[in-house]
Amino acid sequence: MPNPVIHQPEHHRFVIIEDGAQALLEYRMLAPDVIDFVHTRTPAALRGRGLAAQLVVAGVGHAREQGWRVIGSCSYVAAWLEKHAG
């Protein structure tokens, strides 16, 4: 079962909390309708569980629901966007 992704707009991030640790996807708004995902972080204890992908799916999904253009400055996000383009 996927972990719940929590959007924390006041901190410009999406997070998953598991076993007291946080995996996160940070973003910045470049314009009112342009979001740039700048960083993903998954603590070593949480790696290999697909949490970064879950965060990107949630973040990109949120952006698309808003009608925003998505930029992936983070290399993980950029690779995910290229793989899932179309």
Model segments located where?
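Active-site rim helix/loop that mediates acceptor-substrate recognition in acyltransferases
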Residues: 1-13
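Short, surface-exposed charged micro-motifs
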Residues: 4, 24-27
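Conserved beta-hairpin
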Residues: 12-22
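Glycine-rich phosphate/pyrophosphate-binding loop shared by adenosine-nucleotide-utilizing enzymes
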Residues: 21-25, 35
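A conserved beta-turn-beta hairpin within the catalytic core of GNAT-like acetyltransferases
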Residues: 29-38, 69-71
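A short, internal acetyl-CoA/4′-phosphopantetheine-binding micro-motif in the GNAT/acyltransferase core
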Residues: 40-47
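Conserved acetyl-CoA-binding loop-helix of GNAT-fold acetyltransferases
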Residues: 48-59
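Conserved GNAT acetyl-CoA-binding A-motif
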Residues: 60-75
